[in-house]
């Protein structure tokens, strides 16, 4: 049994519906669960013996403001090596041209590349207050091998991140309408068999689980219908969640191919419900949003790609008004060069403000955007044990010193600050499952520079030396160092 007392927080944003902020509080944690939350816990809990055990670790948090840990509901970790490639900017290419350029690069990925891409992405998320992350790993190229998600769990264990792994796939060949090279295609049977293997080996259904598996075919437009039908059947048999991309520009192709809009297509194949959440959704109409609410289907809103792609802005006010579960995701590095989920809170808020005059429903309050990144993410992942700071919830939180110059004049309302002002850099502390995994610019027990050097070395060996990638990097006008 491990007990830790986090003592002396200046403020604590609970993340509850009421927006409760507590002043001068401690958090008492036992085996990853919050068992006490309030002022002067050593004194108030002493009569019942709580926190009096031998060996209680005390962590001084004086001057810090605590927030519930952020929950990332959509990412593609494997794309870390295509960041900051200006020749691949969406502003210069149509979608098909972009796909023709980017997917041959993705096909270079091997097992080491997946591992180090995952370390890089997870570490950046943690530095900015993320405590739980879902990754949609659909890249199974010929070079990758069958154990890519296994290596992602290795990375999560190294860093201490709570991890939901999405085992994705592409099953439709290019000859039948897919835009993805056949070298990255799998059969439905191969995909489903590996989902079963991963669930058997890694999925933990218990409260406070650190690792879970999600069945996540990539998109209806690049998969056979039976891939989705059988995915839904298998996931419900195994008791795990489902995820895919939807409403991100594929609807015209779906109507042309099947005579159905994307969401209707999914509903007719059993791929909606309280165990399903969908990435993006900027194409969803009022009728679609009503169906999402009626079926209990969630949405992962990724604001950063909207700026890059110039697409429609997901109607978050309408979804909120309808009661749709909404969480936030950073998305992959190919459409968001950053893994900073805290930044996405402010981006999402600003996007909705930009579109406010065109919307039927008002923009949610700034605090609601923090809740989408916390409780909303927990709801999408079906994790009632996460998303807020309260007794009985997981001890996942981050903390920031709001007395710095960049927050002066704004720190009177810590609830609204993440959306209105944003955090200017890494947080001061991130705690996951009751353990400090990031504090004062360091990953305890790990050498960040060594992690960076190892990843860079693999990227140089596997990716940057390839003639195609070398040409793309030269296209920036800068000689790679």
From Swiss-Prot:
Record has Cytoplasm as a keyword: yes
GO BP, sorted A to Z: atrazine catabolic process
Pathway: Xenobiotic degradation; atrazine degradation; cyanurate from atrazine: step 2/3
InterPro entries per UniProt: Amidohydro-rel, Metal-dep_hydrolase_composite, Metal_Hydrolase, MTA/SAH_deaminase
One matching Pfam family: Amidohydro_1
Recorded GO CC terms: cytoplasm
Source taxon at top rank: Bacteria
GO molecular function, one term: metal ion binding
Keywords assigned by UniProt, alphabetized: Cytoplasm, Hydrolase, Metal-binding, Plasmid, Zinc
Reactions mediated catalytically: hydroxyatrazine + H2O + H(+) = N-isopropylammelide + ethylamine
Cofactor(s) of this protein: Zn(2+)
CDD domains in the cross-refs: ATZ_TRZ_like
Subunit structure of this chain's protein: Homodimer.
Name of the protein in its database record: Hydroxydechloroatrazine ethylaminohydrolase
Organism name: Pseudomonas sp. (strain ADP)
Gene behind the chain: atzB
């Amino acid at each position: 049994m491990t007990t830790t007392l986090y003592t002396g927080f200046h403020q604590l944003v609970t993340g509850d519906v009421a927006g409760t902020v507590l002043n001068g509080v401690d958090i008492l944690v036992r085996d990853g669960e919050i068992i006490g939350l309030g002022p002067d816990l050593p004194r108030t809990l002493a009569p019942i013996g709580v926190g009096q055990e031998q060996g209680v670790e005390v962590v001084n948090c004086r001057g810090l403001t605590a927030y519930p840990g952020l929950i990332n509901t959509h990412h593609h970790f494997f794309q870390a090596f295509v960041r900051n490639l200006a020749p691949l900017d969406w502003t210069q290419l149509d979608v098909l041209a972009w796909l023709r350029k980017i997917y041959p690069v993705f096909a270079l990925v091997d097992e080491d590349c997946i591992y180090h891409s995952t370390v890089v992405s997870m570490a950046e998320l943690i530095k900015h207050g993320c405590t739980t992350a879902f990754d949609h790993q659909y890249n199974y190229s010929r070079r990758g091998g069958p154990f890519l998600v296994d290596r992602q769990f290795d990375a999560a264990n190294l860093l201490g991140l709570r991890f939901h792994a999405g085992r994705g796939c592409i099953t439709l060949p290019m000859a039948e309408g897919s835009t993805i090279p056949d070298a990255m295609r799998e059969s439905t049977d191969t995909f489903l068999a590996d989902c079963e293997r991963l669930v058997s080996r890694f999925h933990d259904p218990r409260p406070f689980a650190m690792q879970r598996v999600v069945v996540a075919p990539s998109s209806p437009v690049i998969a056979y219908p039976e891939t989705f039908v059988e995915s839904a059947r298998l996931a419900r048999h195994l008791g795990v969640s489902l995820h895919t991309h939807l409403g991100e520009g594929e609807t015209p192709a779906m109507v042309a191919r099947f005579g159905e809009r994307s969401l209707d297509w999914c509903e007719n194949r059993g791929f909606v419900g309280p165990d399903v959440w969908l990435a993006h959704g900027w194409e969803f109409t009022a009728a679609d949003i009503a169906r999402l609410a009626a079926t209990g289907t969630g949405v992962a809103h990724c604001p950063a790609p909207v700026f890059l792609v110039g697409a429609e802005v997901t109607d978050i006010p309408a979804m909120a008004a309808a009661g749709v579960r909404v969480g936030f995701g950073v998305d992959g590095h190919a459409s968001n060069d950053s893994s900073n989920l805290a930044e996405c809170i402010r981006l999402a808020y600003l996007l909705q403000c930009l579109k406010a005059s065109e919307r039927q429903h008002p923009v949610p309050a700034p605090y609601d955007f923090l809740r989408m990144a916390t409780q909303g993410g927990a709801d999408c992942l079906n994790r009632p044990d996460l998303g807020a700071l309260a007794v009985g919830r997981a001890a996942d939180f981050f903390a920031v010193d709001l007395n710095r110059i960049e927050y002066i004049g704004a720190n009177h309302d810590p609830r609204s600050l993440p959306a209105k002002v944003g955090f200017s850099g890494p947080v001061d502390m991130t705690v996951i499952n009751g353990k400090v995994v990031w504090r004062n610019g360091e990953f305890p027990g790990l050498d960040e520079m060594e992690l960076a050097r190892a990843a860079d070395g693999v990227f140089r060996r596997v990716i940057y030396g390839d003639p195609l990638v070398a040409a793309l990097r030269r296209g920036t006008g800068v000689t790679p160092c």
